[in-house]
From Swiss-Prot:
Protein name (database record): Guanine nucleotide-binding protein alpha-3 subunit
One Pfam family this sequence matches: G-alpha
Residue span of region G3 motif: 197-206
Chain positions covered by the region annotation G5 motif: 324-329
Lipid attachment residues per UniProt (N-myristoyl glycine): G2
Region: G4 motif, residue numbers: 266-273
Keywords linked to the UniProt accession: GTP-binding, Lipoprotein, Magnesium, Metal-binding, Myristate, Nucleotide-binding, Palmitate, Transducer
Taxon lineage: Eukaryota, Metazoa, Ecdysozoa, Nematoda, Chromadorea
G1 motif, as annotated region: 35-48
Subunit relationships: G proteins are composed of 3 units; alpha, beta and gamma. The alpha chain contains the guanine nucleotide binding site.
Binding site for Mg(2+): S47, T182
GO biological process: adenylate cyclase-modulating G protein-coupled receptor signaling pathway
Region (G2 motif) location: 174-182
GO cellular component, one term: cytoplasm
């Protein structure tokens, strides 16, 4: 009788196998959904990285979305010149041609012209182009780190011949460089290598940060983006605080947060193209007075990497670092592919499936 399995035992065995099967199915399901959180201080390039993910993995932007971006490009173009004119005033600099004062006054009062505009107003475009060609304005733009000049200013102001055309449609590069403040949470979904990705971008300004941690403790990885080029710039919302130092403080708080102890941490040192140009003129000593190295890209970048790495209080946690240019689609694709492979592998290992 002891050799015979009772009906009750058989039923328990079948139930156990069913539970095991269900648990494995749940593991497989979890392994096939990866949540990524993009974090970083304001204007570091998070939204640009998210747009690149859409271009590379989510069929880009529809014709309707591109059309909607026109108003953003129009406003960014106008705001670029307004910020330069304000910078000119704060730096107490002047136009090369005094007649440009009339154009400046017109531009400063032109907001209403762009409301509901389907085509960039010709009169406004002419005024902006006249100002942009003025040597005084070009001199002010060369000092853009001393005031809040948008990094996209040269692109949009230099593209007015194209932007003012009646049939203008924003290019992918226009959309990548366009900026609107992120408030709340923006999500992009895509599939890669049979894995579903959900990527979240949240507001980077200080006022938005309280929304971060409690919502995202279950993410698989954090991509933290720091603008490496902003070592000599101050915050938009606090002009006494260095942007690089603020970014490092934020990175330290996220990296060592109890909510993210087991979360993979990936650091994008972004805007490396701007950093490469700026380092020729200005040393990183403006942010790091103790820096003793040469004023070169490689040494300066290595020092900043070491600074960020030193903020990690967990010796068992690896920070995966990449130098990036978020507006370069080819480079972003190569880095994202590498990052995503690493995340998929780590996720499968975490579920016991690798």
């Amino acid at each position: 009788m002891g050799l015979c399995q009772s009906a009750e035992d058989k039923e328990l065995t079948l139930k156990s196998k069913a539970i095991d099967k269900e648990m494995m199915a749940n593991h497989m399901s979890q392994a096939k959904v990866v949540k990524l959180l993009l974090l970083g201080a304001g204007e570091c390039g998070k939204s640009t990285v998210l747009k690149q993910m859409r271009i590379l993995h989510d069929h880009g932007f529809t014709a309707e979305e591109s059309e909607q971006q026109k108003s953003v490009v129009f406003n960014n173009t106008l705001q670029a010149m307004i910020s330069i004119l304000k910078g000119m005033e704060s730096l107490r600099m002047t136009f090369d041609k005094p007649i440009r004062e009339n154009d400046a006054k017109f531009v400063m009062e032109a907001h209403k012209m762009l409301q509901e505009a389907k085509v960039f107003p010709e009169e406004l475009a002419n005024a902006l182009q006249a100002l942009y060609s003025d040597k005084g304005i070009q001199t002010v733009m060369a000092k853009g780190n001393e005031f809040q000049m948008p990094e996209s200013a040269p692109h949009f102001l230099g593209s007015l011949d194209r932007i003012k055309l009646p049939d203008y449609t924003p290019t992918e590069q226009d959309i990548l460089l366009s900026r609107i403040k992120t408030t709340g949470i923006v999500e992009v979904k895509f599939q890669m290598k049979s894995v579903d990705f959900r990527v979240f971008d949240v507001g980077g300004q200080r006022s938005e940060r309280k929304k971060w941690i409690h919502c995202f403790e279950d993410v698989n990885a954090i991509i933290f983006i720091a603008a490496i080029s902003e070592y000599d710039q101050v915050l938009f919302e606090d002009e006494t605080t260095n942007r690089m130092i603020e970014s490092m403080r934020l990175f330290e708080s996220i990296c060592n947060s109890r909510w993210f102890i087991n979360t993979s941490m990936i650091l994008f040192l972004n805007k490396k193209d701007l950093f490469a140009e700026k380092i020729k003129r200005t040393s990183i000593k403006s942010a790091f007075p103790d820096y003793k190295g040469a004023q070169t890209y490689d040494e300066s970048c290595r020092y900043i990497e070491e600074k960020f790495d030193g903020l990690n209080a967990n010796p068992e946690k690896t920070i995966y670092m990449h130098q990036t240019c978020a507006t370069d689609t080819d480079q972003v694709q190569m880095i994202l592919d590498s990052v995503i492979d690493m995340i998929i592998q780590a996720n499968l290992q975490g579920c016991g499936l690798y």
